[in-house]
Design a protein with these regions (language model features):
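Hydrophobic core segments of alpha-helical transmembrane domains in multi-pass membrane transport
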Residues: 18, 43, 47, 96-97, ...
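Short loop segments and helix-boundary regions at transmembrane helix junctions
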Residues: 26-31, 69-110, 121-123, 194-198, ...
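Transmembrane alpha-helical segments in multi-pass inner-membrane proteins
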Residues: 182, 186, 192-258
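Cytosolic-side transmembrane-helix boundaries in multi-pass membrane proteins
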Residues: 155-162, 166-169, 241-289
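Single transmembrane alpha-helix segments in multi-pass membrane proteins
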Residues: 3-54, 76-80, 213-221
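Helix-loop-helix "hairpin" substructures at the membrane interface of multi-pass membrane proteins
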Residues: 123-205, 209
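Transmembrane helix-bundle core of multi-pass membrane transporters
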Residues: 84, 88-143, 172-173, 196-198, ...
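Alpha-helical transmembrane segments within multi-pass membrane transporters and channels
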Residues: 21, 54-93, 132-135, 234, ...
Length: 289
């Protein structure tokens, strides 16, 4: 039982990463590769402030740092006219230097530093509470005018622009929110694992996508509320799957990122293959008719 609880707890620590990826990938319908950098940025800021005995300030500042990274990516996309994928790569690359500067080295230990969960009754209740509160707030936000504008921009940006809505501000807000959640996940993880590492963000975009896709397989794609909840659930299930694979020697620890990439690639390829098969059948039926 402890095995599953520990895996579920780790999944909750990464849950906000999955929600952030869900916002850009599904709601904004935009690929954002800033995630690897903003995750570590939030972790670095949280680590430094936690080491200075300010754990809660570390969480807040980590989230704000991620939001700033998202705004930079938005600026590159909207004002510099850089392709979204390249804009994310540029921000992510620049953040590596920022992160190692903030940490002051490749990693920092938090062994004797106070952690946010010590005040809230332990890791599980603290992480669960923070995740639940953030998920509720994000869900409520997407029912507001601002949230609806982001959802509309993801569906049809030209229509939103024709409605005299500032699409630049909408994109900035969406990227800031998504990367704030990703960075908050990194901030939480730093305090829960007891150290911050400059290489911790490697592959986070793939892990986030895998969590989102696993959640959609379980819950389906049925609206914004179910989508956000499914991202959290997908993160937990993903960690349980990985833990089971490692426990029963089905794969080595070095193969984790390969497994994540295969999950994402297969899940994204199946709908396209199914659509191609349907189109082929329809063409055959039309020729017969």
């Amino acid at each position: 039982m402890n095995f599953f609880l520990d895996s579920a707890l780790l999944g909750l620590e990464y849950a906000l990463l999955a929600v952030g990826v869900y916002i850009t990938f599904r709601i904004l319908n935009l690929p954002d590769l800033t995630v690897d950098g903003s995750f570590t940025f939030g972790m670095a800021v949280s680590t430094v402030l936690c080491a200075a005995a300010h754990p809660f300030a570390g969480l807040l500042a980590g989230a704000l740092a991620g939001a700033a990274a998202g705004v930079v990516t938005g600026f590159l996309q909207t004002h510099c006219k850089i392709h979204p994928i390249l804009a994310g790569i540029l921000t992510m690359s620049g953040l590596y230097t920022v992160n190692i500067t903030v940490l002051g080295g490749p990693n920092v230990s938090l062994l004797d530093a106070p952690k946010f969960f010590e005040v809230l009754g332990g890791k599980a209740p603290a992480v669960g509470l923070v995740t639940a509160v953030i998920v509720v707030l994000v869900t409520l936000f997407f029912q507001t005018v601002g949230g609806l504008c982001i959802r509309a921009a993801g569906s049809n940006e030209d229509m939103v622009r024709a409605s005299s809505i500032n699409t630049t501000a909408v994109r900035w807000a969406a990227l800031a929110l998504a990367n704030a959640l990703v960075a908050l996940s990194g901030a939480i993880l730093a305090q829960c694992q007891g150290f911050g590492d400059v290489g911790a963000g490697s592959g986070m975009i793939v892990i986030g996508l895998a969590s989102v896709i696993i959640g959609e397989v379980i819950c389906g794609r049925r609206g914004i509320v179910i989508g956000i909840i499914s991202a959290v659930l997908g993160s937990v299930v993903y960690r349980i799957i990985i833990a089971l694979a490692l426990r029963y020697n089905l794969m080595s620890a070095n193969s984790l990122k390969l497994l994540s990439a295969l999950i994402v690639a297969a899940t994204l390829a199946v709908p396209a293959a199914a659509a191609a098969a349907r189109a082929g059948r329809e063409r055959k039926e039309n020729r017969v008719c």
